[in-house]
Structures are given as structure tokens and as C-alpha cells.
């Protein structure tokens, strides 16, 4: 499969910046899954989708729980799996419309059918937004820790996964208390997460 050269979100962020950032012509920091530290692989699974290697794109129990929570409380809970987030980031825009959600479900089914779990995780780690103008784990590792994602430690990986719900706000230093708490929770979960890379 061909690696995605860019994503819709990269172009949206470029427009939002008033064209001040460089044109998002390519994801030039792409790194194969075999060269990505298992620590960051485990961390994003622990933080975002612990059933990633089990489900077929949708975590129906999480979706049901999110719907009930959103109806009965003021909290807005999401239930997007890594597969759903990958489909959204590669093919779609970031709005919360029903049309986008419908298309996201369609593309999730497609990538689960045509791509292996390893390929989905590889694409996710290379396209996900990790800060203002920062896309993919390699660029994030170089920006925040000044080294390759290949040697990310468990602590660094847990921090990177902890900021994913809101990377443009939560990556500001000093690290907010709720991000630190989330980082510790992810770090505690790492020994129980297995990645299946062929």
C-alpha cells in the first residue's frame, strides 16, 4: 500500500494558520512500524483503544457507554477506535456532523477489510496530530524529546499518548496536572498491553 502523502487535517491547519506554516505537501517523517518503539505503540493502544487487536473497527460496548453517558450527563464522551481515528485522519475532515460520522464508519470498514492491524497502527502513528503543526510520532519525538521515535522510553511514550485527546492544548509546558495523571495511568497499563507486529 502507498503511504498517504498528506491528510485533510494538515491542509485545514495550514489554512487556519493563515498560510504561515509550510505547505503540507508530504508526511516526510514517515517511519515504518518496525522502526517505531514498541513503547509508543503500546502507549497509544493503552490510551486510545485497548481492544484494538480484538475488534473489527468498532468497540460497540464503548460506543453504547458513550451514548448513555452523553444522554444522561453533561460529559461528552467519545468512543472512536484507532481504526476510526485513522479513517478520519486519512480521508475526512474533523467536524462532528452526521455525514462525517457516516463516512468515517464507511472508511473504517474499508480499512479494516483491506489493511492489517499492523498497517492501521502504522498509518495512525504517522498521521495523527501531536501538536501545532506536528504530525506523526517521528516528528513529535524529534520535537519534544530531540530523538527518534525508535528509542522512545515508556515515560516519554506515556506522555505522548496522554496528550492525544487535545494535542494542541495539552502539549504546553509545564504539563497540566490532568495530563500527568493520565500519563501515570497509561504508564501503569503498559505492561499489560501486547502489540502484534509481524
Question: Which sequence ranges carry the predicted segments?
Answer:
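Juxtamembrane regions of bacterial inner-membrane/periplasmic proteins
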Residues: 1-198
Amino acid at each position: 500500500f502507498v503511504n498517504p502523502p498528506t491528510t485533510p487535517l494538515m491542509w485545514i491547519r495550514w489554512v487556519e494558520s493563515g498560510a504561515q506554516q509550510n505547505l503540507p505537501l508530504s508526511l516526510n517523517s514517515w517511519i515504518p512500524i518496525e522502526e517505531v518503539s514498541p513503547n509508543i505503540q503500546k502507549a497509544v493502544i493503552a490510551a486510545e483503544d485497548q481492544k484494538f487487536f480484538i475488534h473489527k473497527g468498532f468497540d460497540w460496548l464503548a460506543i453504547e457507554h458513550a451514548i448513555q453517558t452523553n444522554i444522561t450527563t453533561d460529559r461528552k464522551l467519545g468512543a472512536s477506535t484507532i481504526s476510526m481515528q485513522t479513517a478520519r485522519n486519512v480521508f475526512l475532515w474533523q467536524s462532528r456532523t452526521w455525514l462525517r460520522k457516516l463516512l468515517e464508519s464507511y472508511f473504517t470498514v474499508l480499512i479494516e477489510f483491506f489493511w492489517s492491524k499492523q498497517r492501521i497502527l502504522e498509518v495512525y502513528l504517522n498521521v495523527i496530530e501531536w501538536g501545532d503543526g506536528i504530525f506523526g510520532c517521528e516528528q513529535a519525538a524529534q520535537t519534544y524529546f530531540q530523538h527518534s521515535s525508535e528509542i522512545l522510553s515508556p515515560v516519554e511514550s506515556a506522555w505522548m499518548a496522554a496528550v492525544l485527546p487535545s494535542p494542541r492544548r495539552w502539549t504546553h509546558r509545564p504539563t497540566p496536572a490532568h495530563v500527568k495523571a493520565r500519563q501515570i495511568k497509561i504508564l501503569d497499563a503498559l505492561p499489560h498491553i501486547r502489540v502484534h507486529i509481524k
